[in-house]
Amino acid sequence: CQMAADLGADRVINAAEEDPVAAVRKLTNGSGAHLVVYAVGGPAGPRAFEQGLDMLGVDGTLHLVGLYEDEPLSLPSSKIQRRRVLGGYYGQRIGLSSYRRAMQLLASGQVNAERMTTHRFDYTESAAAFDLLWNHPGDALGVLLEWDR
């Protein structure tokens, strides 16, 4: 959470200290979020997905980019009426323009990826990198595989 604040977040919500759904509802005066990006991996996935749906306001979008354990995600019809749930992160037209914009933000220095990189692995150690991300998601923020070390 401290890194999010250091990188310019207007408000940081620590789900270990407060109910994230209630916090988002309070911040939006009860109307809910326009966009929730679900980028959670590992065993927290299904619960975070449910919370993401609960944070959405009418006509809001939940964008799924995280991977989780092989459990079905609950999609109650009452929670998805007048809301959008988008899955995927590559290969869609909107995805390509998003990548282009992300590269522009990185190149201009508006996004400091170096601060968000917590671990670097040689590509030959990719199994260890994925183990860290999957089994210890709270210990890593950004993990890079390097080919030219």
Residue ranges of model-derived segments:
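C-terminal hydrophobic helical "lid"/dimerization subdomain
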Residues: 19, 46, 50-53, 58, ...
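Conserved beta-strand scaffold positions in the cores of enzyme catalytic domains, especially
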Residues: 12, 85-87, 116, 120
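Active-site PLP-lysine loop of aminotransferase-like
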Residues: 88-93
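Glycine-rich cofactor phosphate-binding loops and adjacent beta1-alpha1 units
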Residues: 2-85
